């Protein structure tokens, strides 16, 4: 019974790794920038007004975020955006 439980745990871990490993690989691109930095600006679905920053491929640019939805290429400051997305 201990062997069956061990094999089940190994199988579960293997499936978990097969699902998460490709996502981890695709998160970083060849130049070292994180994948979210390549997403377009997305103001989201709500109508609130927050000045945020997104990386446009070369620099960080200000945009208006509605407060809900959107994507993760959204930073509260230009400094945070540059730290995460700019080439070293």
UniProtKB/Swiss-Prot annotation:
It is found in: Secreted. InterPro entries: Kunitz_BPTI (IPR002223), Kunitz_BPTI_sf (IPR036880), TFPI/VKTCI-like (IPR050098). GO terms for biological process: envenomation resulting in negative regulation of voltage-gated potassium channel activity in another organism. Expressed by the venom gland. Serine protease inhibitor that inhibits trypsin at a molar ratio of 1:1. Belongs to the venom Kunitz-type family. 03 (sub-Kunitz) subfamily. This is Kunitz-type U15-theraphotoxin-Hhn1f. It comes from Cyriopagopus hainanus (Chinese bird spider).
